[in-house]
Design a protein with these regions (language model features):
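Hydrophobic/basic alpha-helical segments
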Residues: 1-171
Length: 171
């Protein structure tokens, strides 16, 4: 952050400041976030987000009018959204690796048209809060949420097309 602040005195070019932020600051804020993100409290999440908010204020300078508007202008996501996207991407990549296949066991009844069982992956059950907030159950829940979203999108698509699936992309 100090480097970003110093550079902001020499240049007002937002792309240069964004490059410094993305390469020097954001990487430190997100390092190994797929492991520790699920265990964050709301206060810790706000503290981490506060760092990005300060960086965005430095980058925007006098044109800063609010955090959400600045994120849209700079085409940035909140750090929480980025951590969720990275965790989902990590979980999907892990499904393809044989050594991680046991972390995400499939339900026996899970196939595309099953409506009785809403979850595709078995979420490990535990009585301890520490395990419930750890990475593996969090990633399992994240995969289930993504699976349900895809299933709803497919159902909506089939309803729109009256059950006929077209090869042409929908615009």
């Amino acid at each position: 952050m100090r480097l970003l602040h110093k550079f902001s005195k020499f240049t007002t070019n937002k792309s240069h400041l964004m490059h410094i932020y993305k390469s020097q600051v954001r990487g430190n804020l997100e390092y190994c976030s797929t492991v520790w993100h699920s265990g964050l409290t709301e206060a810790e999440t706000k503290d981490i987000e506060r760092v990005q908010k300060a960086a965005v204020k430095i980058i925007m300078g006098n044109k800063y009018q609010g955090y959400e508007q600045a994120l849209k202008f700079l085409k940035l996501d909140s750090l929480k959204e980025r951590r969720l996207k990275m965790a989902l991407r990590f979980a999907k990549r892990s499904l393809k690796l044989e050594q991680f296949s046991k972390l995400f066991p499939l339900n026996d009844t899970s196939h595309l048209m099953t409506m009785r069982n809403p979850e595709r992956y078995i979420v490990n059950v535990s009585n301890t809060e520490r395990y419930k907030k750890s990475a593996v159950p969090f990633l399992q829940r994240l995969l289930n949420e993504d699976y349900l979203k895809q299933k709803k999108d497919l159902t909506r698509l089939l309803q729109v097309n009256n059950g006929v699936v077209y090869n042409a992309p929908i615009t």
